[in-house]
Amino acid sequence: MTQMYCYQCEQTAKGTGCTAFGVCGKSPEVADLQDLLLYVTQGVSQYAHRARALGAIDKDVDVFVTEALFTTITNVNFDEERIEGLIRKAGQMRDRAKKLYEDACRKTGKTPETLGGPATVAIPATRDAMMTEAAKHGVA
């Protein structure tokens, strides 16, 4: 079992966060996958924010960001496969937002910024690889 640190809800013991297993029933694996989902979603948002500043908006990207964030703040669905699917979709949405941003830059004569971190992290092909990647970006 991996180390866990989850502090997102009011159910945490003594208000300090859960470190072994969530009081709500969340497993350390789900917490890790949620951390990775948040990290990749930050990359989506980095591009979407810059595109929006140039007047380019993709409502599907915006809806996805909301869906991803909502997935991590509600303690009602700890389906690892669903979260894994959202991580993969986050990679697709990030690529879509990047293209939107780069196209907006071309149209406005701006040079696109070179982003790093969550804007460039590779989406792992397997669950095990996702868990390894999540360990690099979580709060535990």
Q: For the regions a protein language model found, what residue spans apply to each?
A:
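Metallocofactor- and cofactor-centric catalytic cores in central/energy metabolism, strongly enriched
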Residues: 1-140
